[in-house]
Regions:
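Charged (often Lys/Glu-rich) extended helix/loop segments that serve as interaction or gating elements
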Residues: 140, 149-273
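Short, glycine/charged-enriched secondary-structure capping and boundary segments
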Residues: 26-29, 47-50, 95-96, 130-132, ...
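Acidic, glycine-rich loop-and-beta core segments that form the ion-binding/anion-interacting portion
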Residues: 96-156
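General structural feature for long, well-ordered alpha-helical segments within catalytic domains
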Residues: 1, 19-22, 60-63, 67, ...
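Glycine-rich beta-alpha junction loops
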Residues: 36-40, 85-89, 119-123, 158-160, ...
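Conserved beta-strand positions
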Residues: 14, 83, 117-119, 154-156, ...
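Active-site-proximal beta-alpha core segment in soluble small-molecule metabolic enzymes
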Residues: 1-114, 123
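Short glycine-/acidic-enriched loop or helix-start segments at secondary-structure transitions
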Residues: 23-24, 43-44, 126-127, 163-164, ...
């Protein structure tokens, strides 16, 4: 994969000292980015935190001197530094903190022209929740950057795509057990695995009952043979019936691309308008 990327002229980011040790000839006299673990992990769930000792990503700062020396010995230049703290972060100050951590190691890499601060810009998932403040992040980064002559890169990812998509599914059955009211829909974790995988919250709306009083508390589940096939827990919705159309919001990112045919269930069809 490294060879194919280099042959295609792809800008290569290395996040493991082992690769440089194992294949020095491959990286000889190259211009490279390094992905660093700045030990500043944040995220909406522990499974999406991508920095710190519990994350597999990035070169630990304790190995950075060895990496720099090895690259110098094979005539390679580090022209960019990259880090990604995690996903679903609403606090703009996280990126300022990350930039300041970059600046602590920057004197050791005089050829660096780019600082890539990664992605993870959060998307509001509940009604009334404040969104990510891009203007504040801009102010914080410019203030921290000062007169430093480098490019700042960001990878907005889900921030751009999440709100552009929804999941639609019909109610197939209803069931009550004690105080729990189950609302079954025609698809589940095979189409949207985020709730089951890391407890992601998605707003759910009964499009067939718009304007009706939301006086029923439902657990919304799919048809997959897993107790974890839950789309939403404890949601107040109008009393629903078989055939009602349910909308699950913010599925434009990490929805269809993470779907599967698990349990031989076809995932929801994707329509692009």
């Amino acid at each position: 994969e490294y060879e194919a990327a280099l042959a295609a002229g792809v800008r290569l980011t290395v996040d493991n000292y082992w690769a440089i040790q194992a294949w020095p000839d491959l990286f000889e006299r190259r211009e490279l980015f390094l992905r660093l673990d700045l030990d500043t992990g944040y995220g909406h769930h522990r499974k999406v935190i991508t920095s710190g000792v519990d994350s597999k990503f990035g070169i630990s700062l304790e190995h950075l001197a060895d990496v720099r020396a090895r690259l110098q010995s094979i005539g390679s230049r580090v022209v960019g530094l990259h880090a990604h703290t995690g996903s679903g972060v609403i606090n703009a100050d996280v990126w300022r903190e990350q930039l300041e951590r970059f600046m602590e190691v920057l004197p050791d890499f005089p050829d660096v022209r780019v600082l890539d601060l990664g992605g993870g810009l959060g998307v509001p998932d509940r009604r009334g929740q404040a969104g990510f403040d891009l203007e504040l992040m801009d102010e914080l980064l410019l203030d921290a950057l000062g007169d430093l002559d480098v490019e700042l890169w960001l990878e907005p990812g889900r921030y751009l795509a999440a709100e552009s998509g929804v999941l639609l599914s019909r109610v197939t059955q209803l069931k009550s057990k004690g105080q729990c009211n189950y609302l079954g829909i025609a698809t589940g974790m095979n189409s949207l695995i985020r709730p089951a995988l890391y407890g992601a919250y998605h707003e759910v709306v009964n499009l067939s009952r718009l304007g009706s009083s939301a006086d029923m508390n439902y657990r919304i589940v799919g048809p997959i043979c897993e107790s974890g096939d839950v789309i939403a827990e404890s949601r107040m919705l109008p009393a629903s019936k078989e055939g009602d159309i349910m909308l699950v919001a913010n599925t434009g990112a990490y929805g269809r691309v993470m779907s599967s045919h698990y349990n031989r269930r076809r995932p929801a069809e994707e329509l692009v308008l």
